[in-house]
UniProtKB/Swiss-Prot annotation:
It holds the Pfam family Citrate_synt. Pathway: Carbohydrate metabolism; tricarboxylic acid cycle; isocitrate from oxaloacetate: step 1/2. It is an enzyme of class 2 (transferase). Keywords: Allosteric enzyme, Transferase, Tricarboxylic acid cycle. Belongs to the citrate synthase family. PANTHER family: CITRATE SYNTHASE, CITRATE SYNTHASE, PEROXISOMAL. It comes from Pyrococcus furiosus (strain ATCC 43587 / DSM 3638 / JCM 8422 / Vc1). This is Citrate synthase. Its EC number is 2.3.3.16. The active site is at residues 263, 313. One of its GO terms (cellular component) is cytoplasm. PROSITE patterns: CITRATE_SYNTHASE (PS00480).
Length: 377
């Protein structure tokens, strides 16, 4: 049988299931969560409300939202032994590696951590893990740098609480809003490498923690979540606005990838990037913003005709840099938001579960004869 027509490397444009959670219009550059445009949600909603929307398929009432926020707030703290583990980790541990280790440990001390995934279990544990990720990320950075552990404050929003724990003081309102918007924009993006990893593990009816750890491992990759760190390093490498054009054409000549440009689904400007750019213009370093803006013009002029345009990673790092967030934490912020989408897709998929089991097209030899080792050369 000739299977060539069934081969889709990278699973590009392969649909493995149906979903009510997210829709991407890659041609027009549109993104919807449960039918709501991401632009409207970023402007009017909050991360907590968006998590509720993604998980339960509707915008909450006032009482539903308040109860959900209370559940998140009371789940933010970390057990003493978790803090001790963070203190024992090697100081050169990548923040995503630290996050992976701590969440794995939380699964080990959760009495129901090994229960096979069901939608009910997914959301119950999801509240706890979603609430704890900012505490883990902020305090891992503090501990590794010899600073004191800062416990979370229940009165603060999810976004403000992260910045408070990281910096040791409550953030300005404009920082809180920018971080809240960032988490909304990172919350969900249909199926991608990390979401597929979560769904694949979940499809085996493993536990919630194992599924989420698979997503964290995938997101750590430099061409997935890690690209946000590489994009801002790229602007720093260029150094000044006057050097952008020379750098760009040299990069093209060397067939070097422009970090923050190009996307498997979007063939036009990423709608999330437009929103991040607005906040980068307000909060970002002025010189780096000018470098990025000049490089953006060249990307749009020379690469957009090939379907390569600006993606979410391009501007987001400038927003974080403007809030004095260390570059090494940028990918963990991605995870801080994307836990919402991972959890939603995990619950949706296991509600009608079928184990994910694709095929590989074999191109090797068959019928080879075994040769005893003494006769081999």
């Amino acid at each position: 049988m000739n299977t060539e027509k069934y081969l889709a490397k990278g699973l590009e444009d392969v649909y493995i299931d149906q979903t009510n959670i997210c829709y991407i219009d890659g041609k027009e550059g549109k993104l919807y969560y449960r039918g709501y445009s991401v632009e409207e949600l970023a402007e009017l909603s909050t991360f907590e409300e968006v998590v509720y929307l993604l998980w339960w398929g509707k915008l909450p009432s006032l009482s539903e939202l308040e109860n959900f926020k209370k559940e998140l707030a009371k789940s933010r703290g970390l057990p003493k032994e978790v803090i001790e583990i963070m203190e024992a980790l090697p100081k050169n541990t990548h923040p995503m590696g630290a996050l992976r280790t701590i969440i794995s440990y939380l699964g080990n001390i959760d009495d129901s951590g090994d229960i096979p995934v069901t939608p009910e279990e997914v959301y119950r544990i999801g509240i706890s893990v979603t609430a704890k990720i900012p505490t883990i990320v902020a305090n891992w950075y503090r501990i590794k740098n010899g600073l004191e552990y800062v416990p979370p404050k229940e009165k603060l929003s999810h976004a403000a609480n992260f910045l408070y724990m990281l910096h040791g003081e409550e953030p300005p309102k404009e920082w809180e809003k920018a971080m809240d918007v960032a988490l909304i924009l990172y919350a969900e993006h249909e199926i991608n490498a990390s979401t597929l990893a979560v769904m694949t593990v979940g499809s085996t009816l493993s536990d919630y923690y194992s599924a989420i750890l698979a997503g964290i491992g995938a997101l750590k990759g430099p061409i997935h979540g890690g690209a946000v760190e590489e994009a801002i390093k790229q602007f720093m490498e260029i150094g000044s606005p006057e050097k952008v054009e020379e750098w760009f054409f040299k990069a093209l000549q060397q067939k070097r990838k422009i970090m923050g440009a190009g996307h498997r689904v979007y063939k036009t400007y990423d709608p999330r990037a437009r929103i991040f750019k607005k906040y980068a213009s307000k909060l970002g370093d002025k010189k780096l913003f000018e470098i990025a803006e000049r490089l953006e013009r060249l990307v749009e002029e020379y690469l957009s005709k090939k379907g390569i345009s600006i993606n979410v990673d391009y501007w987001s790092g400038l927003v974080f840099y403007g809030m004095k967030i260390p570059i090494e934490l940028y990918t963990t912020i991605f995870a801080m938001g994307r836990i919402a989408g991972w959890t939603a897709h995990l619950a949706e998929y296991v509600s009608h579960n079928r184990i994910i089991r694709p095929r590989l097209q074999y191109v090797g030899e068959i019928g080879k004869k075994y040769l005893p080792i003494e006769l081999r050369r």
